[in-house]
Amino acid sequence: MRQERVAFERSLAARLVASGRLDEAAAERALRLRAGSEERLEQILTKLGLVHEKDVAEAMSSELGVPMALPSDFPDEPVLESASPKFLRQAQVLPLRDLPDRLLLAVADPLNKYPVQSLALLAGKPVEIRIATPSDVELAHERLYGGEKGAFGRIVDEIEQADDMGPDDDIDRLRDLASEEPVIRLVNLLIARAVESRASDIHIEPFQDRLAVRYRIDGVLREGALPPARLRAAVVSRIKIMAKLNIAERRLPQDGRIRIAIRGRDYDLRVATVPTLHGEGVTMRILDRSSLVEDFGVLGFRPDTLKRYLDLLDQPQGILLVTGPTGSGKTTTLYTSLLRLNTPEKKIFTVEDPIEYQLDGVNQVQVKPQIKLTFAEILRTLLRHNPDIIMVGEMRDFETAQVAIQAALTGHLVLSTLHTNNAAGSINRLLDMKVDDYLVTSTVNGVMAQRLVRRLCEQCRKPRQALPELIERMGLRPLMNGRDTTLYDAVGCDACHSTGYRGQMAVIEVLALSDAIRRLVLNHAEVREIQRVAMEEGMRTMYQDGLLKALDGSTTVEEVLRVTRDV
């Protein structure tokens, strides 16, 4: 068995090198470490951050000719209940399906025959294996067999029972601790729980006597598991190793990225650290490339609003602005727009800080202020590369606005964002940047403003009839058009974690620059006057769009008021 494993691990390392997932020197280093260790090669590779778990699992699958476990293979209820959860957990296996003629089993170590033979004996039938990552197996155990403590508590116990962790300023000891299996599993589990909860961000915050973990779900922060305070340095160090950051540098903020697979699906995590009074804090933004779809309806566009927006998006040249505060979904709207525009006939560039999603067929450029590679500098360069469409992550200053306007005047379509309260306010923001009014009216085709409201959970939302005084006070009557006066309240159930909401959608207003609005801009009219004329020309405000969504039962009036109160 030992010789079989050694031969397999050498073949596995060679396959990873041949596929470009591992360089040859790193492979030799890992094999040398393996010779004097009880750990498997795949454990060493992932522990050192040399290869992602999913890459190792896929290489094992190819090497052995054994299929990978698909996300749909993992059960919702325990399979083969006569099997001991403790045995399954220690063996890193999980029964997937009990079929009439065989047992389907997920395994993290396909060369370990003992649990396969034991379960075949217990089930009284042959076992067919599927390869899965250790994290996916552990997450499934947590979900199916959590018990009183669950996987999180057991991992913490393992770490607590280990040797003394040493002081937080012992970098070599921290590096070793962060590379030990229990800490790796703990951090992977924190990330996996966030993904399972549909979180957009993970916040790890050190305080004097505790380490807080919070997840932002549907725009609202919620408490997660609480690791012991003494683990804060180990947890942060593990994240920094995964993000390829310098674990010895704790005085300065650092930025990095992690790629991780959860239940067979790839996620990118944008990692930012910050030094605080009680240690380093970490924020991780979870980016799911597969969540980007060319479906504006999913984002919250109503058909008539979508038509107004697409009329602007399909213009051959000019500037289209998407505006709203941080976290209002502007970037998602722009990426969805690029998916629609991305055809073989068009050359598209983006200028971003940072690049959030990688888009095939789109040339994406990262801003690097430390070497003076700014938005404006990149834009000037791109104009020499014959683009059709340019997306600028943010029009944050006069210089960037000036070059964007030059691009629009020379026949390019420019998409960008601004931070303003509403669509009409974006025009005045450009004027405040000292952009000439005639250039604004000559280049800006339109502005879309948006905010995010939480979607009502369809499993537990509760209908009620709106009182006449509420209809008048909220301005609902002009929007009803024969609708009944049913509104819905958030209640809370297991499906939505007792919040009453599940998911988010945008409330939107689209302002097209008509001749009348251009005249107002040239006369430096106030924002209220521009908004009034835009509404007369058919623009529906974010507040009105939100009320329609409340009447549809998609959200609540309270949510609409929460996000539109300042517009």
Regions found by a protein language model. Give the residues of each.
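N-terminal, intrinsically disordered, highly charged
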Residues: M1-E280, R285-L292, F296-G297, P303-T305, ...
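Short, flexible helix-loop junctions that flank or precede catalytic/ligand sites
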Residues: D176-R193, S197-V567
